[in-house]
Amino acid sequence: MGVQRYDSRAGLIVVDFQNDFADPAGSLSVSGGASILPTINAEVAAATANGALVAYTQDWHPESTPHFARDGGIWPVHCVRGTWGAEIHPEQKDDGPRVRKGTNG
């Protein structure tokens, strides 16, 4: 490749690559979601090798929230903090900072 995408002034954000979204057993699983893992890991490696910051977001909900259908929202229970579903997919390289969102519902 002739174009360098990353340097020390760049950043890469990996968004919500968690078990509940990426694993077929997850409560909000995206069909074929884990198939993009090699591409994500390659981008993370390229960014890291070129000095870019790599950060990760993580959906991180309390057990009860108006966000969930059982509590009046529209979404199934997912990414409840401290559960398997909320964990970053085990094959995802995640050595950078994490930003947890949805922490208040």
Spans of model-derived segments:
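Active-site acidic carboxylates
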Residues: 1-104
